[in-house]
C-alpha cells in the first residue's frame, strides 16, 4: 500500500511539473529546468552519504572499538539480507538516528550518543532495524527522485516568474502568476506526503527485521519526547535535514501537510497493529505520559564513561 501511494504521489508530482510547464508555455524551459535540477540532485545522490555524515561530525566505529553496537547492526543486516553497512556514532545529546547512502552496497547508518543513552537494547535494535528497512526499500533513491522533480518545479516557477508572465495577456497572465506561486507549495506538500509514506514503510520493515514492533514503538515514544526537548544544531542550521531522522529533529504537534514524519502517536498505533498481526502484542507505550514528564530524558555527557559497548564512550 505504501509503495502504491508513493507511486501515485510521484505521478502527481510529475503531472504538476508538466502542468506548470504547459501554463508557462513551451517545453524548452521545462526541459532545461528538469535537466539542471536532475544534475544537482544526481550530484547530491552520489555524494549524499559523505555530505550528511560530515555535516553531523559523525565518526565511524567498528567491531574493535564498539563491538556490541556494531554486532547488533551486523545481526540485523544478516536478517534483512543486506550487506553490512558502515556504522557511525554522532556525539550529540539530541537522541536520533538515520540511514544514508545511494544503495544497499554503499549504505551507512548512524546513531547519536543521546539515543544510545536513553534506549535499552531491544529499543536500539528496533531503531536500527527501521534504518536498515530504509536501506532495503531504497528510500534514498525514491526521495532523490522526488527531490529532483520538486526542484525542477521550483526552478521552472522561478523561470516563469521572470520570463513567463510578460509574454501573455489578460487571463493567461493571472493563470501564470497563480501557477508560479502555487506549484512550489503543492510540490512541497506532495514531497512531504511521500516522506511520511516511506516512514510507515520503514516502521513495518523494522518491525519485521527485528521481530520486536513493540520495542520500536517504545523507542519512538522516547525519541520523540527527547528530540522535542533537546536542540538539534544541524536542523536549526538546515531545517530540511529534519527529514533524515527516525523522528523529526524539532518539536511539532500532530500531523500536518508540511510534516516530514507522521505523528508519533499514529506510528505507535500502526506498530500496535503490526504487533497484533505478528502475534507479539504487548502493552503500548504511554506516549502522552512520556510527553508530560519533565526531565525524563537523560543524555550522555561526552566526558562520561560507561561500561556498555552500546555506548561509544564505553571501553567495550
Curated annotation (Swiss-Prot):
EC number(s) given by UniProt: 3.4.24.-
Q: Where does Zn(2+) bind?
A: 130, 134, 199
The cofactor(s) it depends on are:
Zn(2+)
Q: Name one Pfam family in it.
A: Peptidase_M48
Q: Which GO terms describe its molecular function?
A: metalloendopeptidase activity; zinc ion binding
Identify which top EC class this enzyme belongs to. Answer: hydrolase
The organism's superkingdom is given as Bacteria
**Coiled coil (residue ranges):** none
Q: Cofactor: bound how, per the entry note?
A: Binds 1 zinc ion per subunit.
The cellular location(s) given in this protein's UniProt record come to:
Cell inner membrane
Gene Ontology cellular component list: plasma membrane
Q: Which residues cross the membrane?
A: 16-36, 145-165, 174-194
Q: Which UniProt keywords apply?
A: Cell inner membrane, Cell membrane, Hydrolase, Membrane, Metal-binding, Metalloprotease, Protease, Transmembrane, Transmembrane helix, Zinc
**How does the entry describe its membrane topology?**
Multi-pass membrane protein
A Gene Ontology biological process in which this protein takes part is: proteolysis
The record's section on Gene3D superfamilies has: Metalloproteases ('zincins'), catalytic domain (3.30.2010.10)
Q: Where is this region: Disordered?
A: 285-316
Say where the protein is mainly found. membrane
Where are the active-site residues found? Answer: 131
Task: Note the HAMAP family from the entry.
Answer: Pept_M48_protease_HtpX
Belongs to which family? Belongs to the peptidase M48B family.
- Full protein name: Protease HtpX homolog
Q: What is the lineage of its organism?
A: Bacteria, Pseudomonadati, Pseudomonadota, Alphaproteobacteria, Sphingomonadales
